[in-house]
Amino acid sequence: MTPVGIVAAVIGVAVVAGLIFWLTRPSQDDVQQATPPAPTTASAPVTTTTTATSSESDERLVRQLPKGYPSGACETLPAPEGVLAQVNCARNVDPDGPESAIFSLVADRASLENAFNDAIAATVRVDCPGKIQSPGPWRRNATPDRVSGQLYCGFSNGQPTVVWTDEEKMTVSAVRAGPTGPTFPQLYAWWSSHS
């Protein structure tokens, strides 16, 4: 492995480890949780795709992001195994937008399911607002007869979290409220208008 490859692998592992820490770090709200988050295991290795392919995948993913992310709000992350591209985004500026988000682009349905399961692994499941099944299928209003993906609602370190897949775009999206909001119903309403 070249020195550049080693550095890229070390950076990738550090970013994934930081992401796992961020998603599982304790907060004061965790003391009140009845069920602690599931423990995480070792991080996934970084893919070894070429720069051109990674760049094309990154651009494709950024074009598919929900509205409300201004220029510079998202940064590209090294993609874990099975993921073509991944970005970490700061606060969405639309009303009741999430405080933070991670969006992933995958190549196939098996990778979509794996990335979805990884995204929800360190959360505590709840029904979505309105007593909507979680996890469960979701549909677009324009195509109510066709499942668009899977939807999941939960808490990550006491913060409302919505995770969903989009089978057409081949994306997994995980959005999270911050300590000051939005509330779960607000975040769910944002998802409903941005998915």
Language-model regions, residue ranges each:
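Conserved polar/disulfide-associated segments of primarily extracytoplasmic proteins
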Residues: L112-S134
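Short glycine-rich, low-complexity/disordered patches
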Residues: A73-P80, D127-W138
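Extracytoplasmic low-complexity, Pro/Thr/Ser/Ala/Gly-rich segments
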Residues: D30-S100, Y188-S195
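Extracellular/mature segments of secreted proteins
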Residues: E81-L84, D96-F103, P135-W138, P160-V163
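Hydrophobic single-pass membrane-targeting/anchoring helices
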Residues: M1-T40
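Extracytoplasmic/secreted proteins, especially bacterial periplasmic and envelope-associated proteins
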Residues: R60, Q64, S111-D118, Q186
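A short acidic-to-branched-hydrophobic micro-motif
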Residues: P95-F116, T171-A177
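Extracellularly exposed regions in secreted/surface proteins, prominently low-complexity, repeat-rich
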Residues: I132-S195
